Structures are given as C-alpha cells and as structure tokens.
Amino acid sequence: MAETIHFSEKFRTALAKYFAYKSVTDHAFNHNIDSEFSGSDVVHVYEIATTELNDYNKKQDPSTGSRFGNVVEVGDHRYTFRLSQDISLDRSVDRGNNNAQFNIKKSGAIMKAYTDKRIRPRKDKYRLKKWAEEAGIHVALDAAPTTSTIVKQIINLHNAMIDEDVPEGEGTLYISRTYVEALMLADQWVGLDSLGGKTLPKGCPGMFDGLVVQPVSSRIFPENCYFAIFVKDAIIAPEKINTFRGIKDSENMDGDRLQYRCKFDAFVMPSQAAGAAVACAKGTVTPTPTVAIAGGKATVTSNEGVVYYTLDGSDPRYQSADAKVYSAAVAVAKGDIFRCCAKAEGKWQSAATYNEVTA
C-alpha cells in the first residue's frame, strides 16, 4: 500500500528560504499581504480614497459652520486580486534507477534542482512581466540606452517617480543584462553610491541614484523594456503551496513519487502605482486619452485600444470594482472624479487621467 509523506511546515519554510536566496525578485516586494491569500485565491483590498485638504477659517462663525471646512466622509476604493498562476509537478523515482531511500533528503534534492532550473526562472519572469505591465509610469525612450545616455535615462525615470511623491529608498533598478555593460562602463558609474554598510541582495553589483541595481538575464526580462524601477511598497507577489507530498511505493510503478503544486501571481498596488516605472521601447506605450467635460457629460478621445473609466476616483488600470468600458459620452455629476486609461494589445497601458467634476 502506498504511503504518503506530507512534508512539515519547517521543511516547506526551508524550501521557501532557498527560493528567496536564488530569486532576483523576492527581495524587492512587499510581503505584508502574503498571508491574506493563505485560505483563498482571491483577496479584496480596500484603499483609502483621499481628498483635497481644507483651509482652516478663523473668521468662520462656529454657530453657522465649521472652521475646519466642509465635512467629507472618508471613502475607499476596492480592488480585487486573484491568483491566476497554478503550476505543478509529479515526478517519479523508479527503484530500478535509484536505490536511495525516498525521504526528505531525497525530495529536497529533487526540489532544489527544479527550483533552480524551472520554478524560480518561471516565477521571476512572470513577476517582472506583470509588474512592468501594471506599472503606473511608462516612459518610451527615443532609442535603446547607450553608455552616453543610460545614466540620464535612469535618473529621469527616477525623477518622474519622485515627482509623483514616491518616497526615496527601498527601490530596485532592474536592468536587462543586454544593457548592464552600458551602465557599468558609463563615467558616472565610477562615482557609485557608498553602500554605508548596507548588505546587497545576491548578484547586485552596487547602487545607483539610491537604487539597488539588479541585473536580470535577458531571457526572462520583459520584452520592449530596457530597465524598470520598483519601490518595495508598490509591488506584491503572493503565493501559496497547495500540495507538497511524497508517495512511497506508488501504484503502477516500482518506485516513489513527488508531487508539488503552487499558486502565485504578482500585482502593483493601485495607490502606489507610481512606485513602479518602466523605460520602454519607442512606440510601445498606448497614448493617454484626452477628456472633455461639459454639459454634464465626460467625452473621451482615444486613438488606440480599449478605454476603461471610473467615476469614484479609483484607478481604472487595475482591478477596480467600479471600472467600466467606455463606448460613449458618460453622464457625470458634481463631485464625481472621472478617470480613464487606454489599453492596446501588445503595448504598455497608458497613464490614467484625473478629472474632478466641479459643476
């Protein structure tokens, strides 16, 4: 009769730590939400909807109104994150080919090999692609980076993030190996940031403009992307191991089996979207739509792709519960916040517009 070995949490944790050590992405994202997916493939995230501040009015008569200004109820935006990736393996060890006892040590060796060659590259590739697709900032460069242009291009992209109030620090510059030479041979690389005793993730050659530099194999780097900057609080990559077990004396064969299944995904946090920025190839970014509001209607003009919009101020680029496909002028009322974006097949998504309806 077959005997099933359900590996302990301690062994699973050790495997996760090994993956993190090898991964080029595991150090870069926020793990705070990981536990929310422990019992579900879907998590609804509520983010506070902020509004403009009031000016305190000392001349206001308290009997007729508040000196603090108009009272506005705090609202929120709901976004839905769903794990879409579901990978598995079912591997056998025939007793005629391997006389070693099937145990934790043996299964660990098998999983180590698959982690190195299959699991880690697939997860890293997917994460980078998904974060790049959902990034809040996409900048199309006129030409591919060179030794004389790459430093300015990186600084400009980082500045675009800071101009959107993205805090400095906890950021990683991901760059394809194709363009690492251009960066490291640039004159400014000689003035590399002092690490100040900071320990860098494995494989990172240094820091530049306050960012950890993480070279990535061109084989797993997103297409039409030269480099990208991701701030830790802006990106997540939840996963959960559904099955991890060994079956001794399996039926239909003289040997043992190892079964593994893992669900995972990667997302950009909508309220932190500007903390993910991508330098793209020319002509690969969907143009941002233009919006005209008049006569109680919002009219959108877009040259490419499908336009999505919201009326509550939530970001239509993400899994907003309020997002709808635009087909004709939309009725709006005072207080609505009309936002829209365009998504075209084979291109990076556009920026999101922001129009507050005041009349």
Label the predicted regions.
Residues 2-5, 15, 32, 36-41, ...:
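Signature of extracytoplasmic/envelope-associated structural regions
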Residues 70-108:
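Long, hydrophobic/aromatic-enriched structural stretches that serve as scaffold segments
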Residues 94-164, 279-282, 336, 359:
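Alpha-helical scaffold segments that mediate packing/assembly in large oligomeric complexes
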Residues 281-359:
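Short, compositionally stereotyped local motifs that mark structural "simplifiers"
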Residues 242, 246-288:
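Extended, compositionally biased alpha-helical segments that mediate assembly or anchoring
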Residues 53-56, 91-92, 182-185, 269:
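Short helix/loop capping segments that flank catalytic or ligand/cofactor-binding pockets
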Residues 1-80:
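N-terminal "assembly arms/tails" that initiate or stabilize quaternary assembly
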Residues 39, 44, 161-246:
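Extended oligomerization regions of viral-like shell subunits
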